[in-house]
Regions:
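Beta->alpha turn/N-cap motifs
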Residues: 44-49, 84-89, 98, 102-110, ...
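Extended ligand-binding regions for polar small-molecule ligands
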Residues: 67-76, 136, 145-147, 154-155, ...
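Short helices/loops that flank or line small-molecule/ion binding pockets
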Residues: 75-76, 84-85, 89-102, 116-118, ...
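Ligand-binding clefts/hinges and TM-proximal coupling segments of bilobed small-molecule sensing domains
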Residues: 159-172, 241-275
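Flexible hinge/capping segments at coil-to-helix
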Residues: 32, 132-148
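Extracytoplasmic small-molecule ligand-binding "clamshell" domains
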Residues: 30-106
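Periplasmic-binding protein-like
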Residues: 47, 124-131, 194, 198-241, ...
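Short helix-initiation/N-cap motifs at beta->coil->alpha
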Residues: 67, 82-93, 135, 152, ...
Length: 275
């Protein structure tokens, strides 16, 4: 009798574990259905990184390149859009904790990040550059031992440690704080995506005192971040991004924020393509 009871206990425990595992998997793997049921998609995006995402001075709404893509994704999902303001260091934690369903916040696709979240096809291609005082050297290697400012949690921060191990990298919560450090002389250069630096410099009252170095620190592809294993949601995101390219809306969004008439004009040298 004792043996039978023990066996029954083992079977019961095994069934409980199996059911728990299935329940957890179902809850994890059905985020698309959860979003549609809730009627809202929560998207982590920047609120201080123009032209990708920043607060409009007149409307006080968050606007930008990323925001327009977030709006398009919400529309194809058939739900309302809830923007969740973030900074580079908080993007992935917000997604993993469930406080955001998607990351549309200028997040670079890297092998390290791909271990913990999934990425869509790239919807933007950029590169890291340096912003320095106008009289500074033009070559990146001249800053090999310099004090360089970067934004926490960005690929630029990581690349600096790899490319210039002798430099002193100072990390900041966002790019405006890094610019303040450059103005104050706390750093000799700051690095960020080329498009963000162009927008930052254009809006600076003292922009004549600074310049963006032409040489790229790195070339980077930007994608939408999705929680690991959410294949159905990822497919919807990818399909919509490819559709936006096909119907010309992706180009229209690009021109609004990076076209010739904008504060940070950049030629569009990429297409959204399946990989």
């Amino acid at each position: 009798m004792t043996v039978v009871t023990r066996d029954k206990s083992k079977i019961a425990a095994g069934l409980f574990l199996a059911l728990s595992t299935l329940s957890t998997f179902a809850a994890h793997a059905d985020q698309l259905a959860d979003i549609k049921k809730a009627g809202v998609v929560k998207v982590a995006t920047f609120d201080s990184n123009p032209p990708f995402g920043s607060v409009d001075a007149k409307s006080h709404d968050i606007v930008g390149y990323d925001v327009d893509f977030a709006k398009a994704l919400a529309k194809t999902l058939g739900v309302k859009l809830q923007l969740v303001p973030t900074n580079p260091a908080n993007r992935i934690p917000l997604l993993q904790s469930g406080k955001a369903d998607l990351i549309v916040a200028d997040i670079t696709i890297t092998p390290e990040r791909a271990k913990v979240i999934d990425f869509s096809v790239p919807y933007f291609v950029t590169g890291q550059q340096f912003l320095v005082p106008a009289g500074s050297p033009d070559k990146l290697d001249a800053y090999a031992t310099a004090r360089i400012g970067a934004v926490k949690g960005t690929t630029g921060e990581q690349e600096l440690h790899h490319r210039f191990p002798q430099s002193r990298v100072l990390s900041y919560d966002d790019i405006p704080l890094a610019l303040s450090a450059l103005r104050n002389g706390n750093v000799q250069a700051i690095t960020q995506d080329s498009t963000i630096l162009a927008g930052l410099l254009d809006g600076a009252p003292d922009k004549a005192k600074y310049k963006v170095l032409p040489e790229l620190l790195s070339k980077e592809e930007i994608g939408v971040g999705v929680k690991k294993g959410e294949a159905s949601l990822l497919k919807v995101v990818n399909d919509e991004l490819l559709n936006l390219e096909k119907n010309g809306q992706a180009v229209s969004i690009y021109n609004v924020w990076f076209g010739p008439q904008t504060k940070s004009p950049q030629p569009r040298l990429f297409k959204i393509e399946a990989k």
